[in-house]
Each structure stands twice: as C-alpha cells, then as structure tokens.
UniProtKB/Swiss-Prot annotation:
SUPFAM superfamilies, alphabetized: Glutamine synthetase/guanido kinase (SSF55931)
GO cellular component, one term: cytosol
One Pfam family, short name: Glu_cys_ligase
Pathway(s) of this molecule: Sulfur metabolism; glutathione biosynthesis; glutathione from L-cysteine and L-glutamate: step 1/2
Official protein name in the record: Glutamate--cysteine ligase
InterPro entries noted in UniProt: Gln_synth/guanido_kin_cat_dom, Glu_cys_ligase, Glut_cys_ligase
Coiled-coil region(s): none
Keywords attached to this entry: ATP-binding, Glutathione biosynthesis, Ligase, Nucleotide-binding
HAMAP family: Glu_cys_ligase
UniProt GO molecular function: ATP binding; glutamate-cysteine ligase activity; metal ion binding
Xref: PANTHER family: GLUTAMATE--CYSTEINE LIGASE
Lineage of source species: Bacteria, Pseudomonadati, Pseudomonadota, Gammaproteobacteria, Enterobacterales
Length: 514
C-alpha cells in the first residue's frame, strides 16, 4: 500500500545537505476559560495588545479564543521555547482565567451567546468580524470554538535545486502538490498517533440526533471506544457543501481556478440566511465560501500575502511557498499544546510525502481518501482495522501500513540526524512505531483513560490549573517582558494607523470583497 520510495531515499542519503534549512512555524488556538471551565466572557485582555496586528498573539473565531503564532524558524528548540514564552506571558495576564488544554470545548451551553472576535473600527477589522458572523450563522458558534494546532513547513531552495535542477515556481509548486496528495493518502497517521479528542461533552451535540454509536458515561460524556479525533469528524468543523467543489491538488493553475470558482459559486442553503436582518449584516455574501479561508482542508498550500492580496492571487503570483498542516489536535500532555516529538515526526513525514511517488488525483479519489481518514478518526485503535487505497476495494491492516511507513521514515531520520547531529529523529521513530502494535500508547487512548475517570470537564479543569501554575512560575527564556510590552504598544499603534488610513466607507470596502 505504501509507494516504493527506495530510489528517492537512496538519492536523499547521497544529498543530505538538501535538507539543511528546513523552516517551520506554529499556530496554537486555545479558549480562555474560568476556573470552573466555563467560557470567559471578558474581552481580549488589553495587556495582550491589538488582536488585529499583534505578531504573536491574536484571536480566532471568538473573543475568548486565543491564537498564538511563532515567527518562521529554522530551529525546533527555539520555536518551541518562543511559543512557551508566549504562553508564559499570557498566563500571567489572565488573572484567574486559564487556557483550555483540549481541542473540544465542554462548558458551553446550547444557545450561549459566544462573543465574536473584535478587531476595532477599521474596514479590515470589521470585515474579519463579519466573516465570523457568517461562520456562526452557517455552522453554529459551537463548532467554531474547537481548537487545533497548525504546523507550517517549507523546504530550502537547495532541496528543489538538487531534486529538480531548478527553483522556478512551477517546479516547486509541483513538488509541494506531490506532498499534499501523499498527505491526503497517508496523513491519517497523524490522528492515529496524535488525535486527542475521542470524546465530547453531551452539550456539544446540542440535542441533535447522531448516527455514531456513542457510549455514554454516567456524567453525560459521549465517547467512541476506538476514536482518535472527533475534532476531525463530521461532528467537528467540516463543511458538507464543500465536498463537491471539485478542487484538486495536481496543478497550481487548476487549484487556484477551483478556489476562485468556489468563492463565486452561490449557495441556496446560505441564501436562506440572507445578508442582513434588522440592519445587522449576517455574512459577507451567500456563496459556498465567503472568503478563501473558509475552505475546510486538513492541509493547505500557502504563500505569504501582500497587503490586500487574496491567498489564491498570492499563489498565482509566486507559487507555493510553504505548507500548512491542520490535522493536529491540541496535545493535552503539553502546556503549549504541542511538543518536540510531534514536530520531529511531522518533519520526517513531510519529507517522505515530498519524496514518495504521488500519481495525480481526481476529485473522486480525493473523496475516497476521506474513507481512510474517517475510519482512523472514528475507530483508529480498533484491533484488526483495515484501510484501502483510493477508491480500490483491496484492504490492508493499518498496523502493517503504519510499520511499513515507519521503515521509510527511519531512513529519512538517519539522514536528518547525520545532518543535524545526535539521534533525535531516530528516537522519535523508535518511540512512535510502537503505537501500531500497542494502540494504548496513542494520545487518544491515554487521554480517554483520564476522561472516563474524571470526565472531559474534570480532565480539562485539572490540566488547565496545572499548566496555569506551571507557566506562571516559569521564567521567560527567549523573549523578555520588555519585548511583550513593546509589541503590545506597537500593535496598538499599528491598529490605529490602519483605522486612520481608511479612505472609503465600510459599504464600499465590502462591495469589493463580497
């Protein structure tokens, strides 16, 4: 089931320097909650500066949904330490509030008014809030409070020069699309190993019927005994109306055209919401996607955008610059929601995905890959579970496929370790491969044991309090208090500048973006 990568691995072993200069970045979302686990109803703390323009600390869907961002970094340890510093500083600014350590929210009641993230009075700030209003009206606010971690990854120019003999945008984009196709085919390994949302609070179902065979604890927790990541399931944030958009990952121009088409495709379902009610705007437009970011995807091709530029225009201009992996649940065993082992695994898996042969993929096959993901998401730890290839009928044991994959990853790890020194990458392979023979070692199995014992609420509250105390007590390491104060002031000044620079009404601005 695994493609033959022996030739590509032999090439890599001869060209280890091609991997020198891998760049990464992290984004972590987390809800601000009170000591009892309920959602904080306070505004974004003033001491954290402007959520519109701060370079490390912003908000996602809700005013209480923090998002922490690291700059692009070539050093894993430095990136994780900076992320920890952002958590340490924030923990000291939150008073008695703390950061929810799980992907799935718990203490949010049906119909509770969740305040949307606010970004000030500028046109762009108001558009961001209106986009969130649209998300709320389309999918419900609760779905939008699910948190995750995003891992951004790029290969150095030296890799593309050595592998393709050229570094033009077409060659590099083709290489990243190969990575993406392999990710769709084999990325289910990420929720298998690191999925950490095998259960939900009953409030999350909002009284709606479900076809999933949930088991229920006395405290009202719903769980699937072999599930890995309900965050990635249809219970989480997936958009069924997007499944037939026909967006594919074979060619840059084809992908961009598909994305632009989706933005302009009207949706009967969303037309029924309307654009305005009682003078209040309800969504940017009634198309399948209000803006490109609404496209649900476990992985995205990206390029840093210029001011006012749409993501697809940036891709068309310069090709793919980096990849955003979006399938990581919050790691509940880390105060910062992610750890070094995960980053090293993702490095290895990304390199494998770009090396392994990846035939072009029709939109039909793309839908078929969802079958494997769903199996792993809902019953990944089930003994004897099998997976298929694309739309074919042949089935293969997950445990065997996983071990075959890790045989390849071990060779990539040896190359990475020879380049960077030490044996850290190989150690990660040795630790994680055991999870295929013993699923109890996976994140989902470990956290489910705690949840069955304490409930989701109890587990979340205990970890939130523990991490709050830990982070508040730890000294800052790579950033200083002065850095945070300076960035707070600078971000507020940047927001004021944006607001002062607006030259047109919001209506005129919106007309250009709708």
């Amino acid at each position: 089931m695994i493609p033959d990568v022996s030739q590509a691995l032999a090439w890599l072993e001869k060209h280890p320097q091609a991997l020198k200069g891998i760049q990464r970045g992290l984004e972590r979302e987390t809800l601000r909650v009170n000591a009892d686990g309920s959602l904080a109803t306070t505004g974004h703390p003033e001491s954290l500066g402007s959520a519109l323009t701060h370079k490390w600390i912003t908000t996602d869907f809700a005013e209480a949904l923090l998002e922490f961002i690291t700059p692009v970094d070539g050093d894993i340890d430095h990136m994780l330490t900076l992320m920890r510093d952002v958590h340490r500083y924030t923990a000291r600014q939150l008073g008695d509030e703390r950061m929810w350590p799980l992907s799935m929210p718990c203490y949010i009641e049906q119909g509770q008014d969740i305040e949307l993230a606010q970004y000030g009075t500028s046109n762009i700030g108001r558009l961001k809030t209106l986009y969130r209003e649209g998300l709320k009206n389309r999918y419900g606010a609760l779905m939008q409070t699910i948190s995750g971690v995003h891992y951004n990854f790029s290969l150095p120019m030296a890799f593309w020069q050595a592998k393709c003999g050229e570094t033009d945008k077409e060659a590099i984009s083709a290489g990243y699309f190969r990575l993406i196709r392999n990710y769709y085919r084999f990325g289910w390994v990420i929720p298998y190993l690191f999925g950490a949302s095998p259960a939900i609070c009953s409030s999350f179902l909002q009284g709606k019927p479900t076809t999933l065979p949930f088991e229920k604890t006395d405290c009202g927790m719903y769980y699937l005994p072999y599930a890995t990541s309900l965050r990635l399931s249809d219970l989480g944030y997936t958009n069924k109306s997007q499944s037939n958009l026909g967006i594919t990952f074979n060619d840059l121009h084809e992908y961009v055209a598909g994305l632009k088409r989706a933005i302009k495709t009207p949706s009967e379902e969303y037309e029924t919401i309307g654009l305005e009610k009682d003078g209040k705007r309800l969504q940017i437009n009634s198309n399948v996607l209000q803006i490109e970011n609404e496209l649900y995807a476990p992985i995205r091709p990206k390029r840093v955008t210029r001011s006012g530029e749409a993501p697809s225009d940036a891709l068309e201009r310069g090709g793919i610059e980096y990849i955003e992996v979006r399938s990581l649940d919050i790691n509940p065993f880390s105060p910062i929601g992610v750890d070094e082992q995960q980053i090293r695994f993702l490095d290895l898996f990304m390199v494998w995905c770009v090396l392994a042969d990846a035939p072009e993929m029709s939109s039909d096959e793309l839908l078929c890959t969802r079958t494997n993901w769903n199996r792993v998401i809902l019953e990944g730890r089930k003994p004897g579970l099998t997976l298929g290839i694309g739309c074919e009928t042949a089935q293969f044991p997950l445990a065997k496929v996983g071990k075959d994959l890790f045989r390849d990853l071990k060779r990539v790890a040896q190359t990475m370790d020879s380049l960077y020194g030490g044996e850290e990458y190989q150690k990660v392979c040795d630790q994680l491969v055991e999870s295929f023979d013993n699923p109890e070692l996976t994140f989902s199995a470990r956290i489910l044991r705690s949840m069955i014992d304490q409930g989701i609420g109890g587990t979340g509250r205990t970890l939130a309090a523990q991490y709050r105390d830990m982070l508040q007590q730890e000294p800052l390491e790579v950033l200083s208090e002065e850095d945070f104060v300076a960035e707070r002031e600078a971000s507020i000044a940047r927001q004021r500048e944006v607001e002062a620079g607006d030259t047109e009404s919001f209506e005129a601005f919106l007309a250009k973006h709708a």
